Amino acid sequence: MEIRSVKGSDYYVITPLINEWWGGRNMSDKLPKLFFDHFTQTSFVAEKDGKLVGFLIGFLSQTHPNEAYIHFVGVHPEYRKHNIGKHLYNNFFNAVKQNNRSVVRCVTSPVNKVSIAYHTQMGFEIEDGDRIVDGLSINTDYDGEDQDRVLFVKNLD
């Protein structure tokens, strides 16, 4: 498997796959092309035998000088549980450290139990929200009306 920095042309390969990889959920509109053009040093693609099998889109915060943010991560369903996500995250963590940052943040939907489990397994902590649902701290309407989110933070120090 090869991990490389994302290129603008990867947008045209990845976006048609996103909804399929998410079991039909409409997710592709959450990843506009600007991420592929402006965050190439902190976004990565995983390929196996020339086939795209995963990606991570992240960036360094302009507002918080010690922080970075993971915006979107996907692994081909047939390649899950092969440590592809772990390699993508580690590449991102290394890029974050090289830029003298030590805090990584990300969010997910409360319905995405796989993502919640994965992030806690990777050492992320769930940040306090404004309510608890099924034992999970939730931030109500974080991304707009009826768009609740679970917020994560990981310290790399």
Where are these predicted regions, by residue range?
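A generic structural micro-feature
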Residues: 67, 143-146
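Conserved acetyl-CoA-binding loop-helix of GNAT-fold acetyltransferases
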Residues: 75, 81-94, 117-121
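Short hydrophobic/aromatic beta-strand or adjacent loop that forms the aromatic wall/cage
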Residues: 41, 145-151
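Conserved GNAT acetyl-CoA-binding A-motif
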Residues: 96-108
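Conserved catalytic-core motifs of GNAT/GCN5-like acyltransferases
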Residues: 105-108, 120-144
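Acetyl-CoA-dependent GNAT
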Residues: 8-12, 16-78, 89-91, 156
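Conserved N-terminal entry element of GNAT/NAT acetyltransferase domains
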Residues: 1-9, 150, 155-157
